[in-house]
Swiss-Prot record:
The modification Phosphothreonine is found at residue 290. Residues 113-142, 265-356 are annotated as: Disordered. Transmembrane segments: none annotated. The lineage of its organism: Eukaryota, Metazoa, Chordata, Craniata, Vertebrata. It comes from Rattus norvegicus. Scaffold protein that connects plasma membrane proteins with members of the ezrin/moesin/radixin family and thereby helps to link them to the actin cytoskeleton and to regulate their surface expression. Necessary for recycling of internalized ADRB2. Was first known to play a role in the regulation of the activity and subcellular location of SLC9A3. Necessary for cAMP-mediated phosphorylation and inhibition of SLC9A3. Involved in sperm capacitation. May participate in the regulation of the chloride and bicarbonate homeostasis in spermatozoa. May enhance Wnt signaling. Homodimer, and heterodimer with NHERF2. Binds the N-termini of EZR, RDX and MSN. Binds the C-termini of PDGFRA, PDGFRB, ADRB2, NOS2 and CFTR. Binds ARHGAP17, EPI64, RACK1, OPRK1, GNAQ, CTNNB1 and PLCB3. Binds PDZK1. Interacts with CLCN3. Binds the C-terminus of PAG1. In resting T-cells, part of a PAG1-NHERF1-MSN complex which is disrupted upon TCR activation. Forms a complex with CFTR and SLC4A7. Forms a complex with SLC4A7 and ATP6V1B1. Interacts with TRPC4 (via the PDZ-binding domain). Directly interacts with HTR4. This is Na(+)/H(+) exchange regulatory cofactor NHE-RF1.
Length: 356
């Protein structure tokens, strides 16, 4: 039972489960004389146990959908349809009985309503802010409940693993193009459009298609693929973190806010020195963002009026950063010319050849 229920406010519990190598780790069954589906057994150390699911709990909702009047098979189908993560709203027998006596329908909204009432209570301002921070953290946790990488472990069958790998020209990485029905890949939870992060514990970030295929083949008849779906991939990119096996059940990173990203970029811009040599400047502008490219297009108009001088001691780094190709070649030519040895006087040449 939750702390609130013990304090006299009976509430259901929301359990977020991530499927492990052996499934979720709980058994569902119906009881004679009772309506609904119940948790019969929770395996030790399983995702179900970690989520707080208890034997004897009655299942009320699956991913926000009420299942109280559904058959055993219908509930099982809903859980399977969620693939590798599921959200279960449950009540223990005591809480269930209390809510029935009060005539309160059991819904996930009960938890949200309780959080709101705690947040709007009129104790001291510091306590209110603390409750608000906890509420925000819990909400953020629920939103990120399914945004984790997945470890898909599979053994090769008679027809292989049963998935196709491909690369997408529009984005880096290797992706799952298709998963064969009833294949080891499907049984492991692998899905089409998943991006491969690790193969058998080795990071595949930045690797070519052939490297990933070789890494899978090197595993023999078994492969462990750490993958992310599209939403999870975008979440980790916002956090500027590469997904790893630590994120399977460990703490998740926090996304960067726009202000933090802008601050980070501006700091990098101040720290990075501008090269005075033409080649590095041009190479850097080729990988710059759109605004720098627009500045580079305007730069010839600014430089046409003033001819570059080889005797100038130093030039503005910003102007060097945006110089045109023609100006860069001219400066390079002048720099080479300035390093040539001075011409020898003709009389000295004549004297030298006479001595020889």
């Amino acid at each position: 039972m939750s702390a609130d229920a013990a304090a006299g406010e009976p509430l259901p519990r929301l359990c977020c489960l991530e499927k492990g190598p052996n499934g979720y780790g709980f058994h569902l069954h119906g009881e004679k004389g009772k309506v609904g589906q119940f948790i019969r057994l929770v395996e030790p150390g399983s995702p179900a146990e970690k989520s707080g699911l208890l034997a004897g709990d009655r299942l009320v909702e699956v991913n926000g959908e009420n299942v109280e009047k559904e058959t055993h098979q219908q509930v099982v189908s809903r859980i399977r349809a969620a693939l590798n993560a599921v959200r279960l709203l449950v009540v223990d027998p005591e809480t269930d009985e209390q809510l029935k006596k009060l005539g309160v329908p059991i819904r996930e909204e009960l938890l949200r309503a309780q959080e709101k009432s705690e947040h709007t209570e009129p104790p001291a301002a510091a306590d209110t802010k603390k409750a608000g921070d906890q509420n925000e953290a819990e909400k953020s946790h629920l939103e990120r409940c399914e945004l984790r990488p997945r470890l898909c472990t599979m053994k090769k069958g008679p027809n292989g693993y049963g998935f196709n790998l491909h690369s997408d020209k529009s984005k880096p990485g290797q992706f799952i193009r298709a998963v064969d029905p009833d294949s080891p890949a499907e049984a492991s939870g692998l899905r089409a459009q998943d991006r491969i992060v690790e193969v058998n514990g080795v990071c595949m970030e930045g690797k070519q298609h052939g490297d990933v295929v070789s890494a899978i083949k090197a595993g023999g008849d078994e492969a462990k693929l750490l993958v992310v779906d599209k939403e999870t991939d975008e979440f980790f990119k916002k956090c500027r973190v590469t997904p790893s096996q630590e994120h399977l059940d460990g703490p998740l990173p926090e996304p960067f806010s726009n202000g933090e990203i802008q601050k980070e970029n501006s700091r990098e811009a101040l720290v990075e020195p501008a090269s005075e040599s033409p080649r590095p400047a041009l190479a850097r502008s080729a990988s710059s963002d759109t605004s720098e490219e627009l500045n580079a297009q305007d730069s010839p108009k600014r430089h046409d009026s003033t001819e570059p001088s080889s005797t100038s001691s130093s030039s503005d780094p910003i102007l060097d950063f945006n110089i045109s190709l023609a100006v860069a070649k001219e400066r390079a030519h002048q720099k080479r010319s300035s390093k040539r040895a001075p011409q020898m006087d003709w009389s000295k040449k004549n004297e030298l050849f006479s001595n020889l």
